[in-house]
């Protein structure tokens, strides 16, 4: 089973930069995107052979997620069932016969960590949501988690310790998530591989210099880790400030 996840930083913009070519080339069983920045009816993208599911933020031009799946889900729903978290189009859950597929766009803590307190609440509530699902059947959770977990996961750890995405608080929450029975599929297969980044700032020629961060993940229920066959970072694929990532499951 081939799965792809990509923070497209605006799907309409990304479609103009080769999104559909990559979509067709990869021919994934399930392809999910984050940060669509869309409202309903603003794009005509309905790939043949796929069912399409969208979750839009209430605020225009902000956040949003989508899933395109060849596999027919038993059930699909948006959000995590908590009003304070469900207005920004951040989560779509698809239930299949033997697993849950949950795509997420985790809230950014923002400059000066304005949203860090909210982020901490989100982390706890979202983790509990995943744990409840995991009691029923294994979970595959791809998305932009807006955290580089360890120093190996970004080019310049020392200068970023107080910046959104690498605060100790955010890193500890990711550790807590893994401790709740989940694995970071990429690190499971590549425990010591440095220079594996998925996001680069548009400033300072960061992508050219490969001064990146790994903040996009496929998190998988621990009991399914043996099924992880390959975890891919499509580093050379342009179109967004993130690159796509892939997961091959047995």
Which residues make up each language-model segment?
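Metal-dependent phosphoesterases centered on the DNase I-like endonuclease/exonuclease/phosphatase
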Residues: 30, 51, 125-211, 215
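Active-site beta-strand/loop signature of hydrolases that rely on acidic residues for catalysis
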Residues: 7, 23-41, 101, 130-151, ...
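Surface-exposed cleft-lining segments at the edges of enzyme active sites
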Residues: 81-82, 107-123, 158-162
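Active-site-proximal beta-strand elements of phosphoester/diester hydrolases
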Residues: 1-9, 98-110, 142
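Active-site beta-strand termini and strand-to-loop segments that position acidic
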Residues: 70, 94-97, 221-222, 247-250
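Structured beta-strand-rich core segments of catalytic domains in phosphoester-bond hydrolases
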Residues: 37, 42-109
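Conserved beta strand-loop-helix elements of the APE1-like EEP
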Residues: 60-75, 204-226
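N-terminal, active-site-proximal structural segment of metallo-dependent hydrolase catalytic domains
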Residues: 1-47, 51, 57, 62, ...
């Amino acid at each position: 089973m081939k799965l792809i996840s990509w923070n497209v930083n605006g799907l309409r913009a990304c479609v103009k930069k080769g999104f559909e070519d990559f979509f067709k080339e990869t021919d994934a069983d399930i392809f999910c995107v984050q940060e669509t920045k869309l409202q309903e009816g603003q794009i005509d993208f309905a790939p043949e052979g796929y069912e399409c599911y969208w979750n839009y933020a209430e605020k225009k031009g902000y956040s949003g997620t989508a899933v395109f799946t060849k596999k027919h889900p038993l059930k699909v729903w948006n959000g995590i069932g908590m009003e304070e978290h469900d207005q920004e189009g951040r989560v779509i859950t698809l239930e299949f016969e033997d697993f849950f597929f949950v795509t997420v766009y985790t809230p950014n803590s923002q400059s000066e960590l304005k949203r860090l307190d909210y982020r901490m609440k989100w982390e706890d509530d979202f983790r509990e949501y995943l744990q409840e699902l995991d009691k029923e059947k294994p979970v595959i959770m791809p998305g932009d988690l807006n955290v580089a977990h360890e120093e190996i996961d970004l080019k310049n750890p020392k200068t970023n310790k107080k910046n959104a995405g690498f605060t100790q608080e955010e890193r500890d929450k990711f550790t807590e998530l893994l401790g709740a029975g989940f694995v970071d599929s990429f690190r499971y297969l590549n425990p010591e591989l440095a220079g594996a980044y998925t996001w680069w700032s548009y400033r300072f020629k960061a992508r050219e210099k490969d001064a990146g961060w790994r903040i996009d993940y496929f998190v998988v229920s621990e009991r399914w880790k043996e099924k992880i066959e390959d975890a891919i970072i499509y580093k050379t694929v342009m179109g967004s400030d993130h690159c796509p990532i892939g997961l091959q499951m047995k």
